[in-house]
Amino acid sequence: MTTLTARPEAITFDPQQTALIVVDMQNAYATPGGYLDLAGFDVSTTRPVIANIQTAVTAARTAGMLIIWFQNGWDEQYVEAGGPGSPNYHKSNALKTMRNQPLLQGKLLAKGSWDYQLVDELVPQPGDIVLPKPRYSGFFNTPLDSILRSRGIRHLVFTGIATNVCVESTLRDGFFLEYFGVVLEDATHQAGPEFAQKAALFNIETFFGWVSDVETFCDALSSTSFARIA
């Protein structure tokens, strides 16, 4: 078992019954010229987040944790995005940006596009699971819940973008399904001002889960490995 120092209190978990979730680390969310950038959100500080996720993924894989990568988006015709009868049609900033800038139609968050692809630095490995998702939450219209339950996984460690949107949405839904959710704060990034990051982390540590960081996470896993060897 591993005990991770976190806020508001430490949490103990078995790495082999825990999944590291990498949320939407796509060009759309982390790269200049991607959807968030084109929609007016600041992505200039995402590079350290990418590096921290690399570190967390390496440590988690070494410890025997399952790695799950999410990609947010829809088919090329945007049928999966929902039409005017869906609130997603009205609230998705990607869809609104394309309606306001018709030349971008078909380029944002469309499966197969550069925007949809994971950033170059983050490459899933054999044994990892890559899941598409059509909405903010990774539990909605995906096999995530059955994948986790069939493996006896009850603890989820979250990284990715955006903390205040897809990360928090997935962690909240996991909470309602009796999963223990931990966010590594320096391996996440918000969509919007910095206060959005702080508010999301406050919500998570106060109501829905736990908050830690990459160095503490890696140290905890390393200590567990040494203990097993001893």
Swiss-Prot record:
Pfam families: Isochorismatase. Induction: Up-regulated by the nitrogen regulatory protein C (NtrC also called GlnG) and repressed by RutR. Gene3D superfamilies: Isochorismatase-like. Its EC number is 3.5.1.110. It is an enzyme of class 3 (hydrolase). It catalyses: (Z)-3-ureidoacrylate + H2O + H(+) = (Z)-3-aminoacrylate + NH4(+) + CO2; (Z)-3-ureidoacrylate + H2O = (Z)-3-aminoacrylate + carbamate + H(+); (Z)-2-methylureidoacrylate + H2O + H(+) = (Z)-2-methylaminoacrylate + NH4(+) + CO2. GO terms for biological process: nitrogen utilization; uracil catabolic process. Keywords: Hydrolase. GO terms for molecular function: hydrolase activity, acting on carbon-nitrogen (but not peptide) bonds, in linear amides. The active site is at 24 (proton acceptor), 133, 166 (nucleophile). CDD domains: cysteine_hydrolases. NCBIfam families: RutB. Belongs to the isochorismatase family. RutB subfamily. Hydrolyzes ureidoacrylate to form aminoacrylate and carbamate. The carbamate hydrolyzes spontaneously, thereby releasing one of the nitrogen atoms of the pyrimidine ring as ammonia and one of its carbon atoms as CO2. This is Ureidoacrylate amidohydrolase RutB. It comes from Escherichia coli O45:K1 (strain S88 / ExPEC). The gene is rutB.
